[in-house]
């Protein structure tokens, strides 16, 4: 079983393919297996690495709640790269993994060839922030006191998951069953330590405006909690592009794998070829007609 030790935590990982490294960072309800449709596709071109976060067996499940935080999630990505002797890599994350990917790019931009930030921003909108904290607190407590199978039934039928269930019942059932087999303790402590305490993307505005790593933002148009944050990220990261997948919810890499893979491949191809450039400031104007007085620094 492939294991690396990062920051004192044993992390399980799966590696397939050869070439430029491409690291996949999973969502709260997933694990390395959640990326199987991407690994099969991208391993033909890249050295793909998918790993289980701390709290997700066979990675370690620390019992100390202080072992879980957004900072730990970021440093585990760095620790994984260090352990595998990878200097720089493309980093692709969904949801919780999208947050970790974004923060990794902000903290360690020299280690990231590019960032794919998918389904990111849940709990960021100011008017929804209090409800988000109430929901997360209550759900974390349930993970720590109720059977994992019960929580999987609830979590996998949320308003941004029903799209996946309706389109692909078999795929959704596999996703549900994998989730139900995970660690309730790991999920409860992850929800308390990561989701409950992480900053809103709107709090990162100044850092986002300084980010120069090529970034692709991907969201489903029925993933309501992530739509507005996705547009915000696009506007603040000058080197970003935004893809909105129609009639899609939160689990976009499994729900719409062909659209997701194609968007990511086109992005990575452009980055690898040096053709992904920062936004022309002249396009940043509220007018649809009158030109901006800003100039393109690359011209």
Whereabouts are the PLM-identified features?
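Conserved HGGG/HGGXW glycine-rich cap/lid loop of the alpha/beta-hydrolase fold
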Residues: 9-66
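Acidic beta-to-alpha connecting loop that harbors the catalytic carboxylate
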Residues: 18, 221-223, 247-249
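Active-site loop/oxyanion-hole signature of alpha/beta-hydrolase fold enzymes
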Residues: 40-43, 49-96, 262-265
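Conserved alpha/beta-hydrolase catalytic His-Asp/Glu region
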Residues: 126-131, 145-207
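Short beta-strand/loop motif that positions the catalytic acidic residue
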Residues: 211, 217-219
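Conserved alpha/beta-hydrolase "acid-adjacent" motif
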Residues: 224-229
